[in-house]
Design a protein with these regions (language model features):
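NAD(P)+-binding Rossmann beta1-loop-alpha1 motif at the extreme N-terminus of oxidoreductases
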Residues: 1-59, 68-69
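Hydrophobic anchor at the start of a short beta-strand
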Residues: 11, 33-34, 131-133, 177
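Rossmann-like NAD(P)(H) cofactor-binding subdomain of soluble oxidoreductases
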Residues: 61, 67-150, 166-168
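General beta-strand structural signal in soluble alpha/beta enzymes
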Residues: 107, 132-137, 177-181, 239-240, ...
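Internal alpha-helical scaffold of NAD(P)-dependent oxidoreductase catalytic cores
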Residues: 123, 127-131, 150-237
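NAD(P)-dependent Rossmann-like dehydrogenase/reductase catalytic/cofactor-binding core
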Residues: 193, 200-204, 229-239, 243, ...
Length: 333
C-alpha cells in the first residue's frame, strides 16, 4: 500500500458475504480492479456463477470483479478492505501481517474486538503500527448497495488524506462517502446500534407499537453517545450517518438481521433457532455482551444494552425486560 493521494486503481475485499460482495460490486462498477477473497469453496462457487446466489441473487458481477481465494495475491492490490465478522477480524489481520506489512488498511466490519471489547482500530493499530487506518460505516443494507440504490456512508480515519482517498474510490452515481476524523465514534455507532436493533425487534415483536420503538431509538442513541464520549469520541458523530442514520435504519427495517433476531426472540425462539432462521451472522448478539462488559468497566449507564444482554445471556423474559425499563426511577432526559 502507499500513502499517496493518487487514485486507488485496485482493491482487495476480504470477506465474500453479503456486505463484502456488495462493496466489491460497487467498487468494480466504479472502474476499480477488485479481487474478492473468501474460502476456497465459496470463491469457486462465485467464480462459476459470476454472482453471489446465496446472499445477492440475480445481481451479476461486473467484469472488473474477480473472486480470488489466494490471499497473497489479493493483498497486493492498492488497498485492502476487510469485511469479515468482528469475531474473525483479528485472525484475518494476522494472516495479512504474515504475508506483508501494510501502510494502510480499511474495513467495513461493524463490531467490537471480542477479546478486548474495544473498537477494532485498536487491534489493527497493534498489528500494523504506523499504518493509516480507516473504517467505512453508515446506514447500509447490502442488497440496496448492490442494486445501485442511493446510499451515503462515513469514511473515518485519523488521516484526512486517507479518508478522502477512500471516499473518492467509493463515490459512484448513487453512492457517496462523507469523511470524518472520529474513527472511534464511527466504529461505536456501527457496533452498538446492532444491540438497539435487537431491542427494537423485541419491542415490535411483543406488539408494543411505534411509540415504544421511537423511545428505544432515542434513548438508545443516548446510550451509544455516552459510551462513545467515555472512549474519547465526539458527541456530534452520533448525530450523523454512522450514528443516528445507521441506528434508525437498523431499528426500523426488516432487512436488518439484528432486528429480525429481536423479532424471533419475541416469538420465543432461542438464539440458535433464530440464527438458523436468519442464516447469516448477527453481530448484535456478540456486541450485546461486549458492550455490556465495556459499559460496566467504564461505569457508563446503558439500561437498554443491559436488558438485551440479560435476555440473550441470562434467559430473562423479554416481557420482564421491557417492564424493568419502564419502571426505572424517574430522571431528567
Amino acid at each position: 500500500m502507499n500513502q499517496s493521494t493518487e487514485a486507488v486503481t485496485s482493491i482487495g475485499i476480504l470477506g465474500a458475504g453479503s456486505w463484502g460482495t456488495a462493496l466489491a460490486i460497487l467498487l468494480a462498477r466504479n472502474g476499480l480492479e477488485v479481487r474478492l477473497w473468501g474460502r476456497e469453496e465459496e470463491i469457486a462457487r462465485l467464480s462459476a456463477d459470476r454472482e453471489n446466489r446465496q446472499f445477492l441473487p440475480g445481481i451479476p458481477f461486473p467484469d472488473k470483479l474477480t473472486p480470488d481465494a489466494t490471499l497473497s495475491r489479493v493483498v497486493e492490490c492498492d488497498e485492502v478492505m476487510v469485511v469479515v465478522p468482528s469475531q474473525a477480524f483479528h485472525e484475518v489481520l494476522l494472516q495479512i501481517a504474515a504475508i506483508k506489512p501494510l501502510q494502510s488498511l480499511c474495513w467495513a466490519t461493524k463490531g467490537l474486538d471480542p477479546n478486548t471489547r474495544r473498537p477494532l482500530s485498536i487491534d489493527a493499530a497493534a498489528i500494523f503500527p504506523g499504518a493509516d487506518l480507516a473504517v467505512i460505516s453508515g446506514p447500509t443494507f447490502a442488497v440496496e448497495v448492490a442494486q445501485g440504490l442511493p446510499t451515503a456512508v462515513t469514511a473515518a480515519s485519523t488521516s484526512e488524506r486517507y479518508s478522502e482517498r477512500l471516499a473518492e474510490a467509493l463515490k459512484g452515481e448513487t453512492f457517496r462517502a462523507y469523511t470524518s476524523t472520529d474513527i472511534i465514534g464511527v466504529q461505536l455507532g456501527g457496533a452498538v446500534k446492532n444491540v438497539m436493533a435487537i431491542a427494537a425487534g423485541i419491542s415490535d415483536g411483543l406488539g408494543f407499537g411505534a411509540n415504544a420503538r421511537a423511545a428505544l431509538i432515542t434513548r438508545g442513541l443516548a446510550e451509544i453517545t455516552r459510551l462513545g464520549v467515555a472512549l474519547g469520541a465526539y458527541p456530534e458523530t452520533f448525530m450523523g450517518l454512522a450514528g443516528l442514520g445507521d441506528l434508525t435504519l437498523t431499528c426500523t427495517d426488516n432487512k436488518s438481521r439484528n432486528r429480525r433476531m429481536g423479532l424471533a426472540l419475541a416469538e420465543g425462539l432461542t438464539i440458535e433457532e433464530a440464527r438458523a432462521r436468519i442464516q447469516q451472522e448477527v453481530e448484535g448478539v456478540h456486541a450485546a455482551k461486549e458492550t455490556w462488559f465495556l459499559s460496566q468497566e467504564l461505569g457508563v449507564e446503558m439500561p437498554i444494552t443491559t436488558e438485551v444482554y440479560r435476555i440473550l445471556y441470562e434467559g430473562l423474559d423479554p416481557h420482564v425486560a421491557v417492564r424493568e425499563l419502564l419502571h426505572r426511577r424517574q430522571r431528567a432526559e
